[in-house]
Amino acid sequence: MNAILGMYPELSPTDPYVMDSPGLRPEGWVMTIEGKKGEKGKEFCGSSNKCYDEIDNESERRTIAFMQKNAKAKKPFFVTYQPMWLNFLKPQAKKDSINGGKIPNSYKKLDEFVGRVMKELKTLGIAENTLFVAMADNGPMSHNPPPGWAMTELMYRGGKGDFTEGGVRVPALAWWPGMIDEKQLVGDIIHVSDLFTTFARIGGATKYIPRDRVIDGVDQTELLLEGDSHSHRDYIHIYQGNVLAATVKGRYKKHWIGVGEGANSGISAAYFDLFQDPKEKNPQLIPLIHFQGQFNAMRERHNMMKKVYPDQENGHGVPYAGLTNARPETLEIGKRLEREKAAMPESVRKYMP
């Protein structure tokens, strides 16, 4: 969770017109939870700005220590790390990048840690037996960003939360000395869910892949290693929340929402050639109308599969009730929720998505 000004009510002046407590600004919120399998979770550090910075420092320390422990025991391991890397509130006096924006400066610290991981793998003597993947987050939040932060659109349109390519397409690299040839540039489609299936295959753990649900990931081992030179995936369905927003097939894309004039007639203009129009600003009705039937068939097959294997329901309940070290203000969140539920004229559960 990224820290924004509203999450720190103590930084704001007293508002004499506030009628509710806590009102819109959260109180007692939990920033980070840590835990182990089979155990209850606990809050890490707290919710201060100092704790926000400490998340990455502690995560990096634990990542290196975990690698060292398993290398010493000659055991295979899997590590996933999603750094905070950008502090919205921390003053930044020194500009470490030529760009000078808050995001480019934050990349410098992240880049240093990536180098530390690669160096440690070599020091431990396991680089040739380890697949290392680094990839970006989808985003950034390009709509009305703070000035000077470099949260700007580049080649693709959109940002975090969008179904346009700027909100879903990210750069990535895979490094495996002796197994993946250097200096390759691959333009194939790989979905993040493919990493699950691919890692299971490379790690000899396919027998642990669940058989009681649909696994979206496609095995991309042959793309990474010598052999088949192309991805086993040429399509992707893109959602906004629980709404199917777009479908990509190869270089072509169909928008299902925001389809513009003519949509109600069944002839939508929202077909795009991503090679020619990466910003998805010039829909091509006439040149691409022959794709209409095929895209509609893809959507119907997808919807039919979801009827057989529906999405899991969202979790409901009192938040943070199981934390072993919950603060009084955190526990108050659950108590307040119960009071508000009891005061409602009817059950709110049936209105929850």
Locate the predicted segments by residue.
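Loop/turn elements at helix/coil->beta-strand transitions in domains of secreted/extracellular proteins
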Residues: 1, 72-79, 126-132, 168-170, ...
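Formylglycine-dependent
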Residues: 1-75, 83-92, 266-269
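C-terminal cap/loop subdomain of S1 sulfatases and analogous C-terminal strand-loop tails that border
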Residues: 5-11, 140-163, 180-184, 188, ...
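Short, solvent-exposed turn/loop segments enriched in Gly/Ser/Thr/Pro and often Arg
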Residues: 7-8, 79-88, 134-142, 217, ...
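Short glycine/proline-rich turn/loop motifs
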Residues: 36-48, 93-98, 175-179, 278-281
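Non-transmembrane alpha-helical segments in soluble domains
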Residues: 64-68, 111, 118, 122, ...
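Histidine-centered active-site microenvironments of extracellular/periplasmic hydrolases
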Residues: 89-106, 112, 119-179, 191
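Long, internal low-complexity/basic segments
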Residues: 260, 265-270, 274-353
